């Protein structure tokens, strides 16, 4: 097994498209984008508290006078990677539901990663931001983000977890062995880095909710 670590989602999507990867661990949106360019299929996602879903949060600097999403009007908002589900697509849709649109009602800034979003808000470079709830909770528990400086003002509905994917043209027997291997993992030492109880099965249809978000925000996903 050869491990390839890419610098961002776009480079991983390209690696999958050119057949340099057999398996890949995508975010929900980056999977949808990769699926448009290559024949891949999701087969497993981490299971936490019995679920293969997770949430995003919208956070705010405690001194910015923001108590609810509507208060973000006129502010600077930090997002992560443009191809990120929970640090871009989901929080942006939460703002859009309150009639707040980037470039019209607030200024958006892409800072690259979830932790960078939280740090930008904590440091006051942005008054609000969006990221994964599990990642935010980890940053707080590690002491990197101070609750007295950053607060959660909204949580999203549940969305499908980051999928493990494989090339669709792999040998069918190999594909089944890979799926079975993931589903049978129960060693705490292996699961600890994933902060997971185990893995659950997922399918392409589970990610239609992400595609629908793209439509809601009038995003041309082919240009990502």
Range-by-range predicted roles:
Residues 29, 52-118, 126-128, 134:
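Bilobed "Venus flytrap"/periplasmic-binding protein-like clamshell domains
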Residues 16-17, 72, 121-122:
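Hydrophobic residues within well-ordered alpha-helices
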Residues 159-161, 165-224:
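An extracytoplasmic/periplasmic, membrane-proximal ligand-sensing/linker region
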Residues 1-29:
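Extracytoplasmic small-molecule ligand-binding "clamshell" domains
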Residues 25-38, 91-97, 122, 127-147:
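A ligand-binding cleft/hinge motif common to bilobed small-molecule-binding domains
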Residues 3-14, 102-119, 158:
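Short helix-initiation/N-cap motifs at beta->coil->alpha
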């Amino acid at each position: 097994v050869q491990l390839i670590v890419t610098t961002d989602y776009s480079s991983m999507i390209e690696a999958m498209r050119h057949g340099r990867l057999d398996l890949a661990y995508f975010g929900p949106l980056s999977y949808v984008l990769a699926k448009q360019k290559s024949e891949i299929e999701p087969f497993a996602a981490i299971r936490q508290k019995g679920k293969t879903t997770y949430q995003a949060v919208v956070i705010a600097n405690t001194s910015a006078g923001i108590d609810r999403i509507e208060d973000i009007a006129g502010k600077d908002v930090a997002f992560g990677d443009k191809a990120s589900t929970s640090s871009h697509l989901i929080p942006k849709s939460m703002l859009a539901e309150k009639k707040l649109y980037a470039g019209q009602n607030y200024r958006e800034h892409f800072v690259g990663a979830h932790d960078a979003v939280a740090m930008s808000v904590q440091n006051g470079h942005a008054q609000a931001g969006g990221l994964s709830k599990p990642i935010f909770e980890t940053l707080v528990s590690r002491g990197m983000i101070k609750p007295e400086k950053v607060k959660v003002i909204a949580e999203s509905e549940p969305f499908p977890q980051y999928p493990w994917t494989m090339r669709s043209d792999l040998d069918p027997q190999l594909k089944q062995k890979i799926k079975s291997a993931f589903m049978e993992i129960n060693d705490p030492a292996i699961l600890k880095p994933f902060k997971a109880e185990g893995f659950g099965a997922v399918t392409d249809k589970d990610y239609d909710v992400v595609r629908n978000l793209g439509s809601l925000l009038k995003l041309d996903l082919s240009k990502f």
